[in-house]
UniProtKB/Swiss-Prot annotation:
Transmembrane segments: none
Pfam family, any one: WAP
Tissues with expression: Expressed by the venom gland.
Protein name (database record): Nawaprin
Family that this chain belongs to: Belongs to the venom waprin family.
Residues of the WAP domain: 1-50
Keyword Chaperone among UniProt keywords: no
Annotated disulfide bonds: C7-C37, C20-C41, C24-C36, C30-C46
Protein origin, superkingdom: Eukaryota
Major location (coarse): secreted
UniProt keyword list: Antibiotic, Antimicrobial, Disulfide bond, Secreted
Length: 51
């Protein structure tokens, strides 16, 4: 179940890099409105989406 919104563009990572380990497999594993997105390290973490 994908949540609404988009993952932030990681070519301009904010915050830089993020947590360098996988913390989720899908959006449904993330709390509230957060999505499972690839962070600047290339790992999947729960991230607040951009509209």
């Amino acid at each position: 179940n994908e949540k609404s919104g988009s993952c932030p563009d990681m070519s301009m990572p904010i915050p830089p890099l993020g947590i360098c380990k996988t913390l989720c497999n899908s959006d449904s594993g993330c709390p509230n409105v957060q999505k499972c997105c690839k962070n600047g390290c290339g790992f999947m973490t729960c991230t607040t989406p951009v509209p």
